[in-house]
Amino acid sequence: MLSQLFSSCFLGMKTPLQAQQNCSFPQRRTFSVEDNKIRIYTPEVEDTVKLLVASDTHLWMSDERENDFQKFSKRMSDAYHVTRHYDTKEDTNPEKAFLETISKASNLKVDAIALLGDIFSYPSEAAIEWAAKNLNDSGIPYYYVCGNHDWHYEGMPGPLKDLRQKWINNRLLKMFHGNDPMKYFVDLKGMRLLFIDNSTYEISYEQLMFLQQQIETKKPLIVMMHIPLYATGRNVGFGCAHPDWKSSNDHSFELEKREPWPRDGHSPVTFKFREEIINAPNVLAVFAGHIHKQSLDVMKGVPQFVTQYNACGAFYDVVIIPQRAISVK
């Protein structure tokens, strides 16, 4: 059954499943996954694009500038000192993993590195400066979007949206190269990458409008964000537009010392955002992190790839490859 579904949606073969699935793509595309290697084949691009996608490094380094904030950063600064390498199974740590990832990107000769949030366990000036320097020294273009930890000082009073804006402006702007941290796009060889901040689990009206405008361009799109979209059967870790995302299911707000999720769950805008993505004919894929485990879901023909956490060295090696359209009579 699974193989039939994939051939129906991605290769254009006519099967009875087409009556049950939304497979009406204007172009035919397919993909393959082997370990951390993802290959997307589509006639919608004319040149090969190579990406390294990483998320959740959880860099925690601090210096004397952190002294006044230690009560807000203590829990996360005590975490991820030693991790287990995803491949060698040997002990490693976030700094080693991050440097190794940059080296891998260089060896793979990627066109860009996409960093999908929680690169930092809290907005540490030392960690942000260290990461930015190593990325800049590599000479590889890199693009970043925030996760829920990058800007969060646990226990600091205030609404999450206000705290996010404050600490992005005060600490993280150097990671964005002048782009709008909430939403921006990057064009690579005719393909467009969309970076959208959903680190509060919610989407703003401005972000929804941005997405709709990008879909209207008809350019081939890849959506990059931290928190995965809800997929059928997934838990609230896949929290962007999850129907069970609400205060009654928020079991971490006391641990993370933040506001609980809203009692009534997501806004209609967030649900609309998900629907726009999975129904868009020109969205090739979604990439996300957050849950620290590798996963794949396909929603109305749109694959969502979630990467394992980079604190253990994991990343996705992604190649988008031109493919001549398949003619089906």
Give the ranges of each region predicted by the language model.
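Residue-level marker for buried hydrophobic side chains located in beta-strands
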Residues: 51-53, 115, 144, 223, ...
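Extended active-site neighborhood of metal-dependent phosphoesterases/phosphodiesterases
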Residues: 32-45, 125-222, 246-248, 255-256, ...
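Active-site glycine-centered loops adjacent to acidic/histidine catalytic or metal-binding residues
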Residues: 56, 118, 147-148, 226, ...
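His/acidic metal-ligating clusters that form di-metal
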Residues: 93, 98-112, 192, 201-300
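Surface-exposed cleft-lining segments at the edges of enzyme active sites
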Residues: 87, 117-120, 191-202, 260-261
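N-terminal active-site segment of His-dependent metallophosphoesterases
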Residues: 19-125
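N-terminal export signals
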Residues: 1-14
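Charged, glycine/proline-rich intrinsically disordered loops and linkers
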Residues: 66-88, 161-172, 239-263
